[in-house]
Amino acid sequence: MQTQKARNGSPDVPKKVSPRAARPLKIAALEPESSSSPISATNRTPKDKSPNVLNRRSPRSPVSEKKRPSRITELELLVSQLQEELKKAKDQISVSETSKKQAEQEAEESRKQLQEVSSKLEESQNQFVETSALEEETDKTGSLVFQSVSQECDWEFSATAGERAGLAAVAHEIRQLKLQIEMVASSEAGHVKQAELYNSEVQLLRGNLMDTLFHVENFRNQLKDCEISEAETEALATETLRQLENAKKAVEELKSDGTKAVESYKKMAVELEQSKSRMVWLEALVNKLQNNPADLENHEILLKDYESLRRGESNEMDEEVSSLRCEVERLRAALEASDKKDQEGNVEASSRLRIQAELQSELKIAKSEIDELKARLMDKETELQFISEERDNFSMKLMKNQKEIDVEAELKKLREAIENLKADLMDKETELQIVSDENETLKSDIHKSETDVQDAFLKLGIAMEEADKSSKKAVRVTEQLEATQASNSEMETELRKLKVQSNQWRKAAEAATAMLSAGNNGKFAENYNQTNSPYSEDIDDELTKKKNGNVLKKIGVLWKKPQK
């Protein structure tokens, strides 16, 4: 009775039954074409078991048969689009990974370049440690900057792509690096200013050096003049010494001549006195003889007597007489000679007086010459004293000149030191130029490395953005796949339920047909045909459309959610 009510009752009953019976048919038509569905075997078994039901339900409208493949194709297109998008996302992820690897390689290359630059900078530091404290500070700051850059680049490039929060810190550190580079540039500007100060000091030193060289030349000229004057004074001193020696010799000769003249004068005076005394004696004798000529005869008588006596005496007396005669003869000769001498004595006296006068005049001349020589000797002594004083002064000058020579030697040493300082300064200038050139090259390298790092960061950011986009797309695709899998699981559960219900309905229908086959064949067939009428199929189609529409709406909502 209940089965009759169900068949002959209100049209709500087939509405409840038809959608449940229509769903498995729809999904059964979808699932054989999709090879990924695991329920295809379970959907085929009821077809094998109940061919009659399928044969009964086979006559359907062509519109529903046309609509079903279109929805299936839409779902297949959605699935294929999702798969293509998943492939694209995977490709983008691989591209982003390759770009990330390239960026890491470029970063490693830039890090190597920075390490090479830092090594070069360290070598330049080792070479120019002794130049100046400023250069050491600049080199240390540069080395610290490059080490910090290299360490930060190492730290930045060793970070994984997942550490997105460190990008802000990296940007901050890049700003700090830029500030440090600006500080280095400012320190280099200060270094340039100090180099300019050094150049100004060098110019001042050059001016002082020119002044010292001018003074040295003046000292040289003065020294040459002193040497010339010294030679002249030495020549004058030798000449004066020679003249002094000649004067001494002349004085000695004059002294010897004077002594000889004095001695001869004394001798002549003695002889003159003797001649005067003789003349007096002869004059007295002559006067006596003139006054007493008898004495002369007496003398002759005495001589004759004496001779006679002597003749009578011994031979000794003869000898005495002869001696007396000789004496008398001598006396006569002496008288005669005295007379002659008296005459000659007057001449000789006059001549002697003349000679004496001449000698006195010569003596006066000699005395005057001696006085002159004494005066000249005094002059020479004064000149000699003056020369000795000049010699002392000259020795003092020589000492001063020796000091000046020492000063000149020191000046030479100072000049050599200044030349060495000039050479060192030129070397330092060349080294400073080289260091400035190297700093410029390092600046350019740093700028290039900064640009490379910025490009790498830009590429990394682009790669990160692409990776984020691809990850978002992958997440969206995975969510869509999960949603489709969830919807598929829901549909599978519903299909299982519908299979169970369809089996129950089939069993009930078979039981009803078995029970009513005896008397109600026509009515049951009619009702059965009514249930299998195109109207019921249309209702089933509408219900399946609604259900599929709801499923499609759910899929569309799930598709649109990640895009928001």
Swiss-Prot record:
The modification Phosphoserine is found at residue 533. It comes from Arabidopsis thaliana (Mouse-ear cress). Residues 70-133, 231-514 form a coiled coil. Residues 1-73, 88-135 are annotated as: Disordered. Expressed in flowers. It comes from the Eukaryota. Residues 33-44 have a biased composition (Polar residues). Acts as a scaffold, mediating interaction of ROPs with different proteins. This is Interactor of constitutive active ROPs 3. Interacts with ARAC11 in vitro. The keyword Coiled coil applies. Belongs to the ICR family. InterPro entries: ICR (IPR029688). Keywords: Coiled coil, Phosphoprotein. Residues 63-73, 98-123 have a biased composition (Basic and acidic residues).
